Amino acid sequence: MEGGSVSDDTVTPMMAQYLEIKAQNPGAILFYRMGDFYEMFFDDAALAAEALDIALTKRGKHRGEDIAMCGVPIHAAEGYLLTLIRKGFRVAIAEQMEDPAEAKKRGSKSVVRREVVRLVTPGTLTEDTLLEARRHNYLCAFAEIRDEAALAWADISTGELSVTACPLPRLMPELARLAPRELLVADERELDWIEEVGCALTPLSRASFDSASAEKRLCALFGVGTLESFGNFTRAELSAMGALVDYLDLTQRGKLPLLRPPVRETVGGTVQIDAATRRNLEITQALAGGRDGSLLSAVDRTVTAPGARLLERRLSSPTRDLGLIHERLGAVRWLTEEPRLREEMRASLRRVPDMDRALSRLALDRAGPRDMAAIRAGLAQAQEIAQRMPAEAPALVTRALEALGGHEALVDLLDQALVAEPPLLARDGGFIAQGFDADLDETRRLRDEGRGVIASMQAGFIEVTGIQSLKIKHNNVLGYFIEVTSTHAEKMLSAPLSERFIHRQTTAGQVRFTTVELSELETRILNAGNRALDLEKMHFAALRTAILDLAGQIGRAARSLAELDLISAFADLAAIEDWTEPEIDDSRAFAIEAGRHPVVERALRRTGTPFVANHCDLSTGGTPAVWLITGPNMAGKSTFLRQNALIALLAQAGSFVPARRAHIGLVSQIFSRVGASDDLARGRSTFMVEMVETAAILNQADDRALVILDEIGRGTATWDGLSIAWATLEHLHDRNRCRALFATHYHEMTALAGKLKGVENATVAVKEWEGDVIFLHEVRRGAADRSYGVQVARLAGLPASVIERARTVLDALESGERESGGRRQTLIDDLPLFRAAPPPPAPAAPKTSPVEERLREIQPDDLSPREALKLLYDLRALLT
């Protein structure tokens, strides 16, 4: 922003106030409230106008230069806010804290008092219009204290607060799991990894991360003397949580959200999945971007926004708690066996609004009447579900049902107080039901009858003046006034009418008047209207207090409804898609019978194509095994690899799985090295990216890991690639001793199946027919002897000359492989590998005959009979 001090005598009082507020909020675009608009000035205006694609104007001068200005209307501000936030800006909102009349009491030149009431950032959003209903909006904080490090995260729109120990090497996988919108870090930290975070990064002062101050802030926030009842937190964990609370206090200007007591996630409590694996498996987001095509989109049958958020959380963080997995699967099994009960529950859940976020907005004093109506509707449906469920239910369902009751008094209060369809904003009034407050009803009657009297008064004035076009109108400047066209002005301004009608204003085409009785009526109407609005605001505050007094119970009910939604969604998915309950135990087994890929199967169904199910058994005599999979491109190796990883993930997320039978020993980690892409921004080739990811797997995978690797070593020379792939497989077998699927085109590696006890060969079957290859997509025991790359290239549409030349080269190379090394070298020396087969020569243009040439020269109309006869003899002679 351009410089300027408030003492500059060229600065108006309003601009001086703006400059002062702006100086207190550096790094944020300032939305400065002026009437019905938020205005922006100086550099803020230029930035906002470009980002929002709105007009940039000017307002006065500052230090001899024009002041850039732009603005957005209050009623549409949230849409503009969302655009700015998504483009990486932070926005400080300065509201008018008094009306102009109050300011004038302090003096004619007094400026309306304004204060920043909120700093809007990506991680601190609460409005429905700014949030994705089915996704969490996490704010994270990373803290390091000596040899300890921790990551804390909160979603202020739902009240969730969690923390975990997080050494720096684990930070990127944790951020990939949580997908936060904003990350808080200490400002002096070396942040070479910033570009990989994928969210807004906000540096804070080291004071914000002080662990001693953090402990005091947290105790005060939760009203306890010690945090020990919530867990034994390390200094780093306290530091991270304290930074979160400090930042929320800053951005919300003292109105802290309704956070639940912190949950400490233990290291190893969930399946470890790194960022590359999440991307390759497309768990919550497809490689093309967006949800469509991801595992999340394929399995999402939830009918509430909180249920959808819980589903994403479970898929992102599958548990390793065997007891919890069995409890969740038992609840899903119960509802698959009770289809009528399941449908009744889902029908009720469809009518449940997002109580979590409504409650958060109420706590932040950012709510409207519709948020109260959401609490009313959600609790009413909770009572209905609790009443319909049978007494005998699995433990998980029973615990959820217990939290749904006990809200009858609040529901009755909200039923009596609120109209059926409340308006969005409390300031508009009209949300308190008739009959709830007799005083309010009487005030409304006076207000509404006063408006009826206006109509009667207008009819009387028309009769007195004889002017049929006379109207009584209202605006915010004049209040109520009488308006006639300029053609009747002389009559109104002349006696006797001028004695009763007092001239107020003349505009183009109209003249405006008032009378004593109209002014008195206006006062009565305005008083009644203002009093009615004041009474409604009073009731709104009382209802807000009544709801927040029960916030803990309401929050538990909301979380229980989300749990029931997810259980019933998993049950519905299993019933419709014919999924089976997996057997999960503490063994090292991994036996999948007739497994399917949930996303690919769904896509094929749209085209009417059946999915070919396949078996997978990575248990050899009770010990982990590695399947070495060979076969052609396009046969389905990558799909087979991914589907088995997704089956393990779904099972530990508490879902049934797409298979006829599944026996899975608890999985601690899932690693995937599938697909290829370079990283130009960091100077990494495709092969380098592959090696980095493979190194991470070999260095981290434990004996409970599930690893899927596809074509390791393909990005370098053949023998280099084969050597790397060979050594990688041996390391997985000998050192990591984990369950693994290893797909390759290096057929030489199939010999390992006879040398390493835990390695077995498998291949994807194909059928050759009249020179074509037919993909059967069946995985069988055994090894492939070729990859059919030339046939796949022909299917891809390579030119026929290229395909023919490739066949020639392939035949020559394969023939050379069967001969001695010297003969093979001679063959390669003689073989022009990089010469394409010559195209067939173009047909030569036919030579013109003498007869044709002579005929072209003839002009028939110019020939006499004698000349024509002679010409025939000449042509005949040419033929001979």
Curated annotation (Swiss-Prot):
Protein name, per record: DNA mismatch repair protein MutS
UniProt xrefs under Pfam families: MutS_I, MutS_II, MutS_III, MutS_IV, MutS_V
Keyword Acetylation in annotation: no
Main function: This protein is involved in the repair of mismatches in DNA. It is possible that it carries out the mismatch recognition step. This protein has a weak ATPase activity.
Keywords of the record: ATP-binding, DNA damage, DNA repair, DNA-binding, Nucleotide-binding
Family indicated by similarity: Belongs to the DNA mismatch repair MutS family.
CDD domains in UniProt: ABC_MutS1
Classification via InterPro entries: DNA_mismatch_repair_MutS, DNA_mismatch_repair_MutS-lik_N, DNA_mismatch_repair_MutS/MSH, DNA_mismatch_repair_MutS_C, DNA_mismatch_repair_MutS_clamp, DNA_mismatch_repair_MutS_core, DNA_mismatch_repair_MutS_N, DNA_mismatch_repair_MutS_sf
An example Gene Ontology biological process: mismatch repair
Residue sites binding ATP per the record: 631-638
Basic and acidic residues biased stretches: 850-860
